[in-house]
């Protein structure tokens, strides 16, 4: 393993572009962004080709649903970015910024209670893309879960959205009217949605 020969300033600069140093070398791992982990077949082929052409041939998936391509030489970073840009792919997702938004598969999952793809894509556009020039004190993570099963762990993020079923409460139903005790205890006003 060769030692790191580039300056700390250059290392910091490319980290801001989504390239993390592979310990003790002049090689980097590129964080290729996805929206909710969704990529087209053509984008997948492009990343696989880029991994073989510029890196060590491996694709790794991060907890924030980005794709990491390891082993890219420092002097090939710009060429790598141009190569993946042909399929609309970009690198990023590092530093003290809003991180890529993650969501579960709630849109298509049998337990999903909301359209987690659409909501997280809107949040991604507004906050990840919209706040890229905003310096934060620390990384800021957002997750969207389609139901309380907690697959994507929204509660472990800085902002977590969890789909919930909204019960329909009918206080004056025939059953409630027959049960005076229930009628006394169910005194609530629900907002209209």
Feature roles, as predicted:
Residues 1-25:
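Intrinsically disordered, low-complexity polar/charged tails and linkers
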Residues 4-6, 30-170, 175, 179:
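Small-residue-enriched alpha-helical segments and adjacent helix-cap loops
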Residues 22-26, 166-170, 186:
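Short, ordered beta-strand-loop transition motifs
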Residues 179-193:
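Iron-sulfur cluster-binding cysteine motifs and their immediate structural context
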């Amino acid at each position: 393993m060769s030692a790191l020969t580039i300056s700390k300033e250059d290392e910091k600069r490319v980290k801001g572009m989504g390239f993390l140093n592979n310990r003790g070398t002049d090689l980097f791992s590129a964080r290729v962004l996805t929206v909710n982990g969704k990529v087209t077949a053509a984008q997948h082929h492009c990343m696989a080709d880029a991994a073989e052409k510029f890196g060590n041939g491996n694709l790794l998936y991060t907890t924030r649903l980005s794709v990491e391509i390891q082993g890219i030489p420092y002097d090939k970073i710009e060429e790598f970015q141009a190569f993946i840009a042909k399929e609309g792919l970009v690198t990023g997702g590092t530093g003290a910024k809003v991180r890529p938004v993650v969501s579960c598969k709630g849109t298509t999952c049998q337990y999903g209670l909301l359209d987690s793809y659409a909501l997280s894509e809107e949040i991604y556009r507004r906050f990840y893309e919209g706040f890229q020039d905003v310096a934060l004190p620390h990384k800021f993570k957002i997750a969207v879960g389609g139901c309380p099963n907690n697959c994507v762990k929204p509660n472990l993020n800085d902002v977590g959205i969890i789909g919930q079923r909204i019960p329909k409460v009918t206080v004056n139903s025939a059953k409630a009217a027959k049960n005076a005790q229930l009628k006394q205890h169910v005194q609530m006003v629900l907002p209209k949605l």
